[in-house]
Curated annotation (Swiss-Prot):
<dbReference type="GO" id="GO:0004521">
    <property type="term" value="F:RNA endonuclease activity"/>
</dbReference>
<dbReference type="GO" id="GO:0000287">
    <property type="term" value="F:magnesium ion binding"/>
</dbReference>
<keyword id="KW-1277">Toxin-antitoxin system</keyword>
<feature type="binding site">
    <location>
        <position position="117"/>
    </location>
    <ligand>
        <name>Mg(2+)</name>
    </ligand>
</feature>
<feature type="binding site">
    <location>
        <position position="99"/>
    </location>
    <ligand>
        <name>Mg(2+)</name>
    </ligand>
</feature>
<dbReference type="InterPro" id="IPR002716">
    <property type="entry name" value="PIN_dom"/>
</dbReference>
<dbReference type="GO" id="GO:0004540">
    <property type="term" value="F:RNA nuclease activity"/>
</dbReference>
<dbReference type="Pfam" id="PF01850">
    <property type="entry name" value="PIN"/>
</dbReference>
<feature type="binding site">
    <location>
        <position position="119"/>
    </location>
    <ligand>
        <name>Mg(2+)</name>
    </ligand>
</feature>
<dbReference type="InterPro" id="IPR050556">
    <property type="entry name" value="Type_II_TA_system_RNase"/>
</dbReference>
<comment type="similarity">
    <text>Belongs to the PINc/VapC protein family.</text>
</comment>
<keyword id="KW-0378">Hydrolase</keyword>
<dbReference type="InterPro" id="IPR029060">
    <property type="entry name" value="PIN-like_dom_sf"/>
</dbReference>
<feature type="domain" description="PINc">
    <location>
        <begin position="7"/>
        <end position="129"/>
    </location>
</feature>
<keyword id="KW-0540">Nuclease</keyword>
<comment type="subunit">
    <text>Probably active as a homodimer, which binds to a VapB2 antitoxin homodimer, which then oligomerizes further to a hetero-octamer. When in complex with antitoxin VapB2 the toxin activity is inhibited; 1 VapB2 may suffice to inhibit toxin.</text>
</comment>
<dbReference type="GO" id="GO:0017148">
    <property type="term" value="P:negative regulation of translation"/>
</dbReference>
Length: 141
């Protein structure tokens, strides 16, 4: 059994059904090993076509099975610190504010960021935190 836990980004969340590892991830989600931030939940709500769809998504799996990690002042401070370190290297306009907050949440909570977003790789190169890229099948052309 693994002690590893993940923090899912929206980039991975929307591609879960396209993953050849969907069954593995579903099992991990059911076991409470895949967490989500309030920020990612807001992104999901923003993408919903209407309130009814948003409410349904939040009350059904996979979202309903994911423990929520909320922002703290320490997380916000770390996100700002990482943004400043990225600015020192001229890369501060790459990662979005949600990406910085999600990465800081994962780093300070001991979670691995599950993503399909190169900006998390850039952040991890700086912070040394764990990330995992979701394996998925790209959409057919």
């Amino acid at each position: 059994m693994t002690d590893q836990r993940w923090l899912i980004d929206k980039s991975a969340l929307v591609r879960l059904t396209d993953s050849p590892d969907m069954e593995i991830w579903s099992n991990r989600i059911e076991r409470g090993l895949v967490h989500i931030t309030g920020v990612t939940r807001l992104e999901v709500g923003f993408s919903a076509e209407c309130g009814e769809i948003a409410r349904r998504e939040f009350r059904e799996p996979p979202l309903s099975a994911m423990p929520v990690e909320y922002l703290t002042p320490r997380i916000e401070d770390r996100a700002l610190e990482v943004q400043t370190l990225l600015a020192d290297r001229g890369h501060h306009r790459g990662p979005s504010i949600p990406d910085l907050l999600i990465a800081a949440t994962a780093e300070l909570s001991g979670l691995t960021v599950l993503h399909v977003d190169k900006d998390f790789d850039a952040i991890a190169a700086l912070t040394g935190q764990k990330t995992e890229r979701l394996t998925h099948r790209p959409p057919s052309a």
